[in-house]
Structures are given as structure tokens and as C-alpha cells.
Amino acid sequence: MLVKIVLFCLLLTTTAFGQVDLQKPFRECGIEGSTTIYDYKNKKWIYSNEADSQIPTLPASTFKIINSLIVLETGVVRDENEVVPWVGKTDTVLYGYRPDIYHDMSIKEAFEKSAGWVYVELAKKIGKERYLDYLKRCGYGNQDLAGSEGADFWNFGNFAISPANQVTFLRDFYEEKLPFSKRTYEIVKRIMVTERTNDYTLRAKTGWTRYGGKDTGWWVGYVERQDNVYFFATRLIKPRSTPNRRFGACRLDITKAILRQMQVLD
């Protein structure tokens, strides 16, 4: 009898996910990409494009998740409230013109507003040797930091991570299996919260780089519900020569549409 119940529950799960049209949100946005999801309770991978989920690209600002862990663990900053002084200038050709972030800024605000200049300054203090040590220990990306002239190898150069690797990293982060202290985990989990309701907590980070003639956009994170956790990584890629005003918004719109179809989000 127990076996029948388990099989019935698995059938319901498979049927529910099978009814989800994972390609529809991409068609509606008119853009190519993929969403990779891991159902923690059922140990089930869900792909909109499994082949794409294995292809590594620059992580862009999604790297701020592991970057925040590293700067805290190494003591480069004390906590999320430590303020980094504004450096006075930034390369607007590389990073765009964003006057709203040109001021002294805490780590918490820098994460929320994705202020790249803050993390560039912190990266200079960490150095690539220490980065490589943590990246290897965390199994994060290809650990190739060559090809970037500046400190932000996560936006420019050869460094790359696949959507599936993003998800496995987030799962290890959630389980606190990585080489960081409990305090460091708690701080980063706090600053990652983007939405909290009575039913779920959403922790996530966006990313967008314009390197190599392409726009590469990300949204990665996880949704904690009372009975399960769902990890996700959505990546969109388009030629820079092909305009799409919805590119930035579609990172979130596509992901949320899929998660709503799966009844993960309200």
C-alpha cells in the first residue's frame, strides 16, 4: 500500500511538471536562453533546455553571491553594513552611466543595487590567488581568471559558469556545505532576500554583462517554502546588435512565469 502511495505522489509531481510549458515565457519575450530548476525535496532536475544548462558563460553580477561570502570570510569587510567609500569615478563605457550608485555604499546596498564598483574595490584587496582558492574549494565555475585586464574577472574574460553549476552551488550554499562560517552564511542569506510572503522566501541575484559582443543576462536564486526548496538559474543571451528593450525584465519575468506554473510562487 505504501509503495502505491509513493508511486501515486511521484506521478502527480511528474504530471504537474509535465504540464508546464517551459518554452512559452521565452517565446513571449522573443529571446533565447534557458531556465534550470532543482526540486530539493524530490531531488528532481527540471530543464527548459538541458544542453544549454551545461554551457558555461561569464556569471556577471550573480558572482556577487560567492563574492560576498569571500569578502566576509576573509575579513575584507566586517559585515553587510560596512561602508565602502566612493572612488570618485568609474568607466561608464564598460559599466554604463548609473549616477544613483555613485556614493559611499554599504555592502548590503551594493548587493541590492548591484553596484559593481564596490565589488571591484573589494576584489583588489582579495587578489586572484585567494579567489582561486575559494573557487576551487566551492567547485564554482571553470576557475580560469585569465583574459580580464581589470579586477572584475566575473564580467570580462575567460571565467565562466554553467546554469547547472549555478544551481549546484546554490544548493551547497543553502546546505552550508561550503568553506564559510555560520556567521558568513547568515549575513549573505539576509542580503539575498528579495521577496518574503507568508508562503515563501525568495533569495536571488541578477546579472548582466555585455562582453564579447553579447548581452548575457542572469537571474539565479532559490525559493524556500514550508515543505520544499526550489533552486533556479535563468540565463538569456542575445547579440548586442539585436535590440530588445525587455531583456533585463525578461530575466525575472521568464523565471517567475515558470515558477508560477509550477505553483512555487503565488
Range-by-range predicted roles:
Residues 20-25, 29, 124-129, 174-266:
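Structured C-terminal helix/loop/strand segments within mature extracytoplasmic catalytic/sensor domains
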Residues 16-53, 58:
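Beta-lactamase-like hydrolase cores
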